[in-house]
């Protein structure tokens, strides 16, 4: 996403909030400094009482999935983003479960990690098309209803 932020550097009203303490955090911070990006803000890990507010503040939720686990998993943060009605920008293989979820619920778009320009264009499209953003947001909220704790109990 830092490369996407770099392409959108002149869009003064677009911010990238990066939450967590993953092993790539220091590299990402270094990249933002090298590129002179003031649009990227880093937040530490957040507890479950705080996190929903941060996620709900976003106009787009980003979910990444590596190639090795693409066929068998969906990152858990996906469900938190659905619950707050975030349109999704997913970086994952087109054949992944995550790509299927986004396609099935029509609540975002899935990109290959090399499609940096397309990701930037998608963000600009959502910024400039509030009707589309609202539709995707509503679809995320509707999708969240299928992924409740109670529904999960039906499969355990």
Question: Where are the regions that the model predicts?
Answer:
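An anion/phosphate-binding loop that grips the pyrophosphate of nucleotide cofactors and donors
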Residues: 58
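Short hydrophobic signal-anchor/transmembrane segments that target glycosyltransferases
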Residues: 1-13
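Residue-level signal for the nucleotide or nucleotide-sugar donor/cofactor binding architecture
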Residues: 46, 76, 114, 147
